[in-house]
């Protein structure tokens, strides 16, 4: 994302339009980009930013417009609007008391040729809990999640799983494994493959009725006959999550699940994910840079830096990370 944005800015065009440029950026990268855009605006450039991460955008802009219900309205009070769209979402789930591990990572490392991505990761993912991975862009969070999902194999170390002993510790991932382990990719385009939303959500669902129930939860039933690739990024994200949730996995791996969501949609998504978590007792593992919802998805948090777990904690670690 940084590469594409930098390439666009390097063209020297005087009118710059950016659609969700901060979607997957960590807080420092987002601040650097907005400072650059502010400098360009000061030099006479016209900069238009379409973005949902308003906490990162509003301090740098001159004018704000809200688009909704087919209308474009100018926002006069930026501070008031910021508060209404960025208030942290509360976590209404009971305090998690479990300590039995579902995944036990021991000295896990991963390299690609000469590039070392993860050096020495050791941590336990609690069964039935909600774990959040924090860290800057490029620190290896997505790689770590893919290792847990058995999409990659560690270069060194061991990841023990306690989902079901029949899967063993070295067994290759198969259809039965992914019935238990649901993966939400960072880019929904990578996992949407059916010709309609109905078929996408129903593909692995427990039943057609349950697929419809989940679609209603996520507010996508009206898109039932649409092709998934014809949808907006926010709609694609909701469809991709609904399709995996409809399979009732025991483990839900979410890589930047809130990309493209407005505040109302984000609140609804958190409500649904946590409600299903309470109902099913699933284990959730999330990567996010979204300060609005990180605490609402967290019982346990790990901060990844320089290829190792630099810090671990709970919601207090999430607050420390975003405050810093």
Describe the residue ranges of each PLM region:
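H-loop/switch region of ABC-family ATPase nucleotide-binding domains
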Residues: 51-52, 288-289
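Helix-to-loop junction immediately C-terminal to a conserved catalytic motif
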Residues: 149
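Catalytic Walker B motif of ABC-type/P-loop ATPase nucleotide-binding domains
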Residues: 16-19, 252-255
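Conserved ABC ATPase signature
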Residues: 227-231, 235
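The feature captures the beta-strand-to-loop junction immediately N-terminal to the Walker
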Residues: 134-136
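Conserved ABC ATPase "signature" region
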Residues: 208-223
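ABC ATPase NBD Q-loop/coupling interface
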Residues: 158-176
């Amino acid at each position: 994302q940084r590469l594409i944005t930098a390439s666009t800015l390097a063209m020297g065009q005087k009118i710059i339009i950016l659609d969700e440029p901060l979607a997957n950026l960590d807080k420092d990268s987002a601040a650097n980009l907005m400072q650059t855009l502010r400098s360009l605006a000061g030099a006479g450039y016209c900069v238009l930013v379409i973005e949902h991460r308003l906490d990162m955008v509003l301090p740098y802009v001159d004018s704000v417009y809200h688009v909704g219900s087919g209308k474009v309205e100018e926002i006069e009070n930026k501070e008031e609007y910021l508060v209404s769209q960025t208030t942290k979402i509360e976590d209404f789930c009971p305090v998690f008391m479990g300590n039995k591990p579902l995944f036990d990572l021991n000295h896990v490392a991963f390299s690609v040729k000469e590039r070392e991505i993860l050096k020495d990761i050791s941590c336990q993912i609690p069964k039935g809990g909600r774990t959040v991975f924090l860290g800057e862009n490029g620190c290896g969070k997505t790689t770590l999640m893919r290792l847990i999902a058995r999409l990659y194999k560690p270069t060194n170390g061991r990841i023990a799983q306690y989902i079901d002993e029949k899967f063993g510790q070295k067994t290759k991932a198969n259809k039965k494994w992914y019935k238990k382990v649901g993966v939400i990719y960072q880019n929904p385009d990578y996992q949407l493959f059916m010709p309609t939303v109905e078929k996408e959500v129903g593909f692995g669902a427990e039943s057609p009725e349950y697929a419809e129930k989940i679609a209603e939860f996520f507010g996508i039933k009206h898109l039932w006959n649409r092709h998934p690739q014809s949808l907006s990024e926010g709609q694609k994200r909701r469809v991709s999550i609904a399709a995996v949730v409809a399979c009732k996995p025991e483990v839900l791996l979410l890589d930047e699940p809130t990309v493209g969501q407005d505040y109302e949609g984000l609140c609804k998504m958190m409500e649904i994910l946590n409600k299903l978590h309470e109902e099913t007792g699933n284990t959730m593992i999330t990567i996010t840079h979204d300060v609005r919802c990180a605490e609402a998805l967290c019982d346990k948090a790990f901060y990844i830096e320089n290829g190792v777990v630099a810090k671990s904690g709970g919601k207090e670690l999430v607050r420390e990370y975003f405050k810093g």
